[in-house]
UniProtKB/Swiss-Prot annotation:
It comes from Vibrio parahaemolyticus serotype O3:K6 (strain RIMD 2210633). Pfam families: DUF493. Gene3D superfamilies: 3.30.70.260. Belongs to the UPF0250 family. It comes from the Bacteria. GO terms for cellular component: cytosol. This is UPF0250 protein VP0718. NCBIfam families: PRK04998.1.
Amino acid sequence: MLTINSDAKLKDLLEFPCSFTYKVMGHAKPELPELVLEVIQRHAPGDYSPKVKPSAKGNYHSVSINITATSIEQVETLYKELGEIDIVRMVL
């Protein structure tokens, strides 16, 4: 997860607003994409079409979603809240 102290380089690389992709990996549950979209809509409302890919064994799914980020604070908040979803194991 990004923190206030570790995001200096990320801040330097990004010019807001910008396109930003989140990849959320979690248990292969049908509600995973809906839970991810719910968090995204709270902080970056829009019309999204997440891409869902199953793992090789089918135990996990990855949900990729692209947003228009408006600030580093928004990026950090989304990383934090997406990671707090119960069935999520990792956010990239």
